[in-house]
Amino acid sequence: MSRGILVFSEQDEGNYELLTKASEFTSQLGEVYALVLGQKEQVTIQSLVQYGAKRILTVPGVDPNTLDAESIAFVLSEIAKNSGPDILLIRSSRLGKEIAGRVAQKLGAGCVTDAISLEIKGPDLVAQRYTLGGNTISSEVIMTTKKVISVMPRSFEARPGQSAGAAEVKELAIPSPRVEMVERRKKTSESNNVESADNLICVGQGISRKEDLVIINEFCVALHAELGCTRPLAADFHWVSEERMVGISGKKCKPKLHVSIGVSGQIQHTVGIMNSKVIVAINKDKDAPIFKIADYGIVGDLYQVVPEFTRRIKAART
């Protein structure tokens, strides 16, 4: 039997998602640990308990924003060696994936990155992840005793109430980093809520010109929705910020309502919207793959359909 699960994310929301999932496995895999970097208020510690943490390990007196992946990996690996947890769940951000690889190397452990689901099958913890460019889903089992898994953001729902009572809190020390942070520059990017939006509108190559995005933006305003896009519009055409790219190489979203406009529906994009509560697709190609996953489909020219939607929504609200 595993001696526990250690959870780490540089963001509170990621911690809550991973803790919720880890709590489902306590009877089979042992207690849930959480690592906290820097000084945290008591309310934050209590939140970790509410989401399932039974043991909280803190490293006070450090600025988590200045710690490099190696320093964090060292702490995680030392916890796994000395405190007991055999399974490490790490949020699969850019930093998280680097940390996961470093921790696995230090522990001599197997590592799965970008997992989208976790389940117990017999004696095994099975992780599923997209492979072959998102065209297939692979089920993978790590055979080493220590196991490192990085989990894609928003793969699980964060649910409080997983645990009650107090948790054991223990302070740890961290050695001086071998890498010194000389300067930190914030990347200039527009602010958006693509990942957390209740309503999300994604536009694809069905839009002919950058100037035509105005009709999509008007629709977003009318529907109180965030704008997302497929990879070509952001990475190839540069019509939309890459911060709004949805799919296997972009954001993973769980809106209550997702409207897909001029999107063909290739798997590289749809993996980012699979968890939407309701999907509405607008495409003039009746055979577009997007209709296979849509709850509602409209076969029509987006240049006619979208403005009409906008007009009717505005009329209904006046």
Where in this protein do the model-derived segments appear?
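N-terminal glycine-rich FAD/FM-binding segment characteristic of electron-transfer flavoproteins
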Residues: 1-318
